[in-house]
Every structure is written in C-alpha cells, then in structure tokens.
Amino acid sequence: MNVIFLGPPGAGKGTQSKRLEARYGIAQISTGDMLRAEVAAESAIGKQARALMDAGQLVPDDVIVAMLESRIAQPDCAKGFILDGFPRTQGQAVALDSMLKRRGARIDVVLFLEVDEEALADRIAGRFTCATCGAGYNDLFKKPKVEGTCDVCGGHSFVRREDDRRETVAARLVAYRKQTAPILPYYEAEGLLRRIDGMADIDTVTAKVFEIMDAITKK
C-alpha cells in the first residue's frame, strides 16, 4: 500500500503518518530526512545533492525522485510506503508516477487533510515542545498536566519553532496555496483523493484515516 499525505503545514500529516506506519507496517518517508541521509552516506546521488546545496541551489525534482526510488527499494518498504511532504508540485507528482510505473508500482490513495487556515494558524502558533525529550504540546488543546513540567520526562524547559510564529505561518500557507494545492485536482482526476476533516481532534482524524485504509486493503 503506497500512500501520500497532503495538507497545509501544521495540518497533522506527520502525526497521522506515524500512526499509519504503526498500524499497517508501511514505512513513513520524509524527503527531508532521506536527503540528509543520502548526503551523509556520500552516495552518488547524495554527492550531487550536496554540490547543489553548497552552491545555494535547490535540489531538482529528478534528483529527489532518484533518491526516493533508492529509498523505496529498501526492505522496510516491502509492504509499501507513506509520503509526507512530497510531492509538492504537479511536476513532482508526474515524475513520481512515472518512476513508480517503471517499477511496476503505483500510488494507492492520497489522503488530504482539510483545515480552516485561520484556525490552523492559531493551532501552529500554539505549538511547543519539551527541550529534553521532544514531546509535543499546544497552548490551545494539549498543555502539560502540570504547568511547566513535561508529562513524559519531567523536564522544565520548552521551546517553540521559529517558523511557527504567526507571520511565518501566514507566509507558509500562501506558498502552500500557490505551489501545492493545485496538485489536488491531479489526484482527484485519478480517483485517488480522499478528503478528511483535519480540524477534528487527532483521534477522530486517525479513525477516519484507518476507515479509508481498511476499505482499500479489503478490496
């Protein structure tokens, strides 16, 4: 089962991807992590990407797709994979489909988390994490049980991401609307797109994701 998660930044794609991975045994793939791993391993593709990044250039789609092809050939992807954060453009979507077709594979479903952008901005701006263990919290709906103390490790230091500031979030949402949102019709035309209310609580969203996945796997 090969899955793509789509949705604006902060919609909960990472959280739901991890839950999907745990339930169905399919590997979650972060293109950012994948890129860093190839560079660290000094593979041929990694060296090419490193040279581009050192020159201040973006890594082109064909290099990313080549890395992805190498990644999905790994044993942990035998049952399938989950893509979180890729593709981001229609060009990437087309390149991904072409690569998978060459391998005799395909995308089985595209899960789109729909959210209200104003509420989403509030949600993102409220995020903070434990500086010690990385446990996540939110000012709006998930504060530590004891104020100033991490529920998981008991730490007392918390951090907020610089790009979670409201003005930064607004810029990220604008970029998303211009770049990524237009690929929704592409997958809708393929009959792969499934829309999910991303504003529901996390467990409700997970239940809907599992419902969709179970229906597909039973076909």
Swiss-Prot record:
InterPro entries: Adenyl_kin_sub, Adenylat/UMP-CMP_kin, Adenylat_kinase_CS, Adenylate_kinase_lid-dom, ADK_active_lid_dom_sf, P-loop_NTPase
EC nos: 2.7.4.3
Annotated GO CC locations: cytoplasm
Coiled-coil region(s): none
Catalytic activity: AMP + ATP = 2 ADP
SUPFAM superfamilies in the cross-refs: Microbial and mitochondrial ADK, insert 'zinc finger' domain (SSF57774), P-loop containing nucleoside triphosphate hydrolases (SSF52540)
Positions of Zn(2+) binding: C130, C133, C150, C153
EC class: transferase
Matches recorded under PROSITE patterns: ADENYLATE_KINASE
GO BP, one annotated term: AMP salvage
Cellular compartment(s): Cytoplasm
Alphabetical keyword list: ATP-binding, Cytoplasm, Kinase, Metal-binding, Nucleotide biosynthesis, Nucleotide-binding, Transferase, Zinc
Protein family (similarity comment): Belongs to the adenylate kinase family.
Domain notes: Consists of three domains, a large central CORE domain and two small peripheral domains, NMPbind and LID, which undergo movements during catalysis. The LID domain closes over the site of phosphoryl transfer upon ATP binding. Assembling and dissambling the active center during each catalytic cycle provides an effective means to prevent ATP hydrolysis. Some bacteria have evolved a zinc-coordinating structure that stabilizes the LID domain.
Function noted in UniProt: Catalyzes the reversible transfer of the terminal phosphate group between ATP and AMP. Plays an important role in cellular energy homeostasis and in adenine nucleotide metabolism.
HAMAP family per UniProt: Adenylate_kinase_Adk
Name of protein: Adenylate kinase
Gene: adk
